From Swiss-Prot:
This is Secernin-3. Belongs to the peptidase C69 family. Secernin subfamily. InterPro entries: Peptidase_C69. Keywords: Pyruvate. GO terms for biological process: proteolysis. The keyword Zinc-finger does not apply. The active site is at C6. It comes from Danio rerio (Zebrafish). Pfam families: Peptidase_C69 (PF03577). Plays a role in thermal nociception. Residues 1-5 form a propeptide. The modification Pyruvic acid (Cys) is found at C6. The modification Glyoxylic acid (Cys) is found at C6.
Length: 417
């Protein structure tokens, strides 16, 4: 059982409306996996270690505030943003270099670590690649004993630019994106435009017989398989994603990105054993004085979910409605051998949404009413956020409970149906 889908997108001026950067991602994971949305405030740390999903690494003196969408069983994140409006999403990729099953840093750990430690997209590239060099990547990426492993690619953006970072073990290449749009799927996509790279990347490829040392170096051509079903499936979605971005080129907005993430015909909104278990859209104005707005579903299938806004302000409390139960040291992920059981990780919103989704699937009048009210709520929040995106935030206290309040409005939609 391998994922065929996972897609991350970014659009920059002049492709977007209003001098904004629009970031979006679907997290496509096992259909029974719960994805939570959690917030961690900025924090100063004493010298010591931080425990990631499988290993401990050196902690830094200060970590930035982050909002994350993540599989509820692990430490890292599939996607998220930080207080400096850096956004990151990662994808599984496979290539000629074998993925390591030994426990190290997961790609999802690297997403969180970069968000906690980097205040620009380029610095996030440096954080990830430095950690790769020191600790490596590897370990089981699913909550069972299957031993499912992969390399990672990352799409990273901030207020000014975006970066694509693609890895194969400790080797990597990175491409800067300063205008237009870019997307990544479950395949390597960096070719000859390489703006940063591992110092041994080309030498290693030559030693492996993947490159002759003379022809023009294309990271994708050298490090990819020549042909696999996974790459072919991802290639179809990669091209479809580009087409959907091109269709709205010049006026890409948050609504555009939400529509793309909901597109089932292209395979971007995944269904089946692997499905879109969580979705994110961020709107980042280029002007420093304007806030970024980060929308998360915290529920499966964006087509029947509500994108809810989050804004970084002081004193944001824990996001209790989208946080899964904590099992501490008794969690089967922490015990060895790992994954001997699977606890119920459903958070309050997931439980209520699960009931509502079943009603929607029945295709009756009640389900149609729920869907309409969900869309109305989302539209209302998009319109409300437009004021902050254009005028800034005068009273930040109004936004402290923004995400949680919106979840409670979503609860009301489900309760009234």
């Amino acid at each position: 059982m391998y994922p065929r889908s996972c897609d991350t997108f970014v659009a920059l001026p002049p492709s977007t409306e209003g001098q904004r950067i629009i970031f979006g991602k679907n997290s496509d994971r096992p259909c029974d996996e719960v994805q939570e949305v959690v917030y961690f405030p900025a924090k100063e740390h004493e010298p010591g270690k931080v425990e990631c999903t499988y290993i401990e690494i050196e902690q830094v003196e200060k970590t930035f505030a982050v909002v994350l969408s993540r599989p509820a069983w692990l430490w890292g994140a599939e996607m998220g943003a930080n207080e400096h409006q850096v956004c990151i999403g990662n994808e599984a990729v496979w290539g000629r270099e074998s993925a390591d099953g030994d426990e190290a840093l997961l790609g999802m750990d690297l997403v969180r670590l970069a968000l906690e430690r980097a205040d620009t997209a380029e610095k996030a590239v440096d954080v990830i690649t430095d950690l790769l060099e020191k600790y490596g990547q590897g370990g089981n990426c699913m909550e069972d004993e299957c031993g499912f492993t992969y390399h990672n690619s990352f799409l990273i953006s901030d207020r000014k630019e975006a970066w694509v970072l693609e890895t194969a073990g400790k080797h990597w290449a990175a491409e800067r994106v300063e205008a237009g749009y870019r997307n990544i799927s479950n395949q390597y996509s960096i070719t000859t435009k390489i703006d940063k790279e591992h110092p041994g990347m080309r030498t290693y490829a030559k030693e492996q017989g993947w490159w002759d040392g003379e022809s023009e170096f294309s990271f994708t051509d050298v490090y990819s398989y020549s042909s696999t079903a996974r790459i072919q499936a991802a290639g179809g979605r990669y091209c479809e994603g580009q087409k959907l971005l091109q269709k709205s080129n010049g006026h890409i907005s948050a609504q555009t990105m939400m529509d793309i993430l909901r597109d089932k015909e292209s395979g971007i909104n995944m269904e089946g054993m692997f499905m879109s278990t969580g979705s994110m859209v961020s709107v980042i104005p280029k002007a420093d004085h304007l806030p970024g707005v980060h929308f998360f579903t915290a529920t499966p299938d964006p087509e029947r979910s509500v994108f809810k806004p989050f804004v970084f302000v002081s004193d944001v409390p824990p996001l209790k409605h989208t946080s899964s139960p904590c099992f501490g040291e008794e969690d089967p992920v922490k015990k060895k051998p790992r994954f001997q059981s699977k606890p119920n990780r459903k958070h309050p919103l997931f439980l209520k949404h699960e009931v509502a989704a079943a009603i929607i699937d029945s295709s009756g009048e009640r389900g149609q009413k729920i869907e309409k009210e969900m869309r109305d709520l989302e539209k209302q929040k998009l319109e409300e956020m437009e004021k902050y995106l254009t005028e800034g935030v005068e009273d930040s206290s109004l936004l402290v409970h923004l995400f949680t309040d919106t979840v409670e409005e979503e609860f009301s939609v489900y309760s009234s149906a």
